[in-house]
Amino acid sequence: MSAQNNLKQWEDHITGEFVTKDVEQSLATMVEDASVMHMPTRSGGKGKAELRAYYRDMFIPSIPAEWQHTMTNRIVTENTIVEEAKARLHHTKQMEWFLPGVPPTNKWIDVELVIVIEFRDGKMATERIYWDQAAVLRQIGKL
């Protein structure tokens, strides 16, 4: 598929996660055996059934109301998107996918992300999200 199609799939996916908070909207952008992995915490899943539960029960409900995501660089090809972004969030909710076992600290966290998305048949096949967990832990006083 085209780079333009891949970008549209990615934008629809993150809109489902962060704007409309619609699990099915995000899943519609993915192949049946898609995988998602937040690498520092090994949180995510494989296959739409597992990802549906992950997004519904863990990821989407834990996104704080005060979450800002700013894309700083993006490379889009026919097979892959690599995105660099900055996130700023107010840690007011339990976020097992981001800070496992850490109750809300009410602190602001700034984190740089690298997201790698691979596509197959015009849909997202893999999504890997990387960040510096030590930098996050320092900001909340855990390191």
Language-model segment annotations:
Residues M1-L143:
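C-terminal and inter-domain tail/linker signature
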